[in-house]
Amino acid sequence: MTEKIKNFQDLRIWQKGIEVVKEIYILTKKFPKEELYGLTSQMRRSAVSIPSNIAEGFRRYHNKEYKQFLYIAMGSCAELETQIIISYELGLSLIHI
């Protein structure tokens, strides 16, 4: 019998999202100071948005609302992917997607 997940923190996708946040913070810590309010800030916001939207959607009453927040999280993933590509192209990161 499978247990019903009662807390968003038990979701593997939320846990992976938290790992992404930590990795992005480590990566952007190495960026030049002049990027603090540019790419650094944008990448951190995009990363934080991923598990945040998963958690918020989990707390919604209807599945339709939950799905909407999952779509928003997916959009944040696409934003972050683009920003990682930009950081690579600018020579700020060795990560290539």
Which residues fall in each region the model found?
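Amphipathic alpha-helical assembly/interaction segments
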Residues: 1-94
